[in-house]
């Protein structure tokens, strides 16, 4: 997700949600590196915490649920946090789990 966001819709041709749906429809989506960035290139950008970039990551998680993705979703390039690397990993995983729960709740209604 993060690399796609770096290129942005203009650079990649479609947004990340459309890309998820496209690759899933061709059975070519196996592993998702879940991260966010401040903005797409060509402007200077930086990696952000998952909830602090330009992409609505809830939309990405919803797209993964819609295509019934059953592969691996991992946090990727976690920015440093006070408390060390483990704090950033814990934050990222907890945020991702909350997104999964929120999206699953939407689909169960």
Predicted stretch roles:
Residues 1-109:
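Histidine-acidic metal/acid-base catalytic patches
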